[in-house]
């Protein structure tokens, strides 16, 4: 009986850290959000506000907030090679962990006329847990070892 309980605990731990399915809503280099932000929208009202700040007057993509939530990472103003990519979302302990890769490039005189503001916005299954954002510094093909390579962790309040 004790072995069965231990096996169930191990399965529950592994399941809790399984990657959440994510779907990209938008990704690019032309956001109107020109400061670095990590955002979570759990309601349609919050999502509309984020989308309007990001894209202006265009309509926000539809999201079913009874099932899903939106996570966005905005890189702020950057040089011509700047980019953002959300590489994974997992449940770990009592929080949702969003891992993303950020490529920064300096603004030089030539690139100041064409500001790059990279972003990545995804939809994931809704969770009420706090969300933590982690910048991943590992190479793209080494995400399995993410714990060794996480550089920065930030917590985002769940009041969104």
Predicted feature residues:
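Exposed, flexible binding/inhibitory loops of compact, secreted disulfide-stabilized domains
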Residues: 16-160
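Positively charged n-region of N-terminal signal peptides that target proteins for export
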Residues: 1-3
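Hydrophobic h-region of N-terminal signal peptides that target proteins for export
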Residues: 6-17
């Amino acid at each position: 009986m004790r072995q069965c309980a231990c096996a169930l605990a191990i399965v529950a731990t592994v399941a809790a850290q399984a990657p959440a399915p994510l779907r990209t809503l938008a990704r690019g280099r032309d956001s109107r959000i020109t400061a670095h932000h990590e955002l979570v929208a759990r309601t349609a009202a919050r999502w509309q506000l984020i989308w309007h700040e990001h894209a202006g007057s265009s309509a926000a993509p539809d999201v079913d907030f009874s099932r899903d939530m939106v996570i966005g990472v905005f890189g702020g103003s950057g040089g011509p090679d700047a980019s953002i990519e959300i590489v994974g979302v997992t449940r770990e302990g009592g929080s949702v962990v969003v891992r993303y890769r950020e490529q920064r490039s300096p603004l030089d005189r030539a690139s100041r006329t064409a500001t790059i503001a990279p972003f990545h916005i995804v939809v994931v299954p809704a969770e009420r847990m706090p969300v933590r954002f982690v910048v991943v510094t590992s190479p793209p093909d080494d995400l399995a070892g993410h714990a060794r390579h996480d550089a920065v962790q930030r917590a985002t309040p769940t009041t969104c």
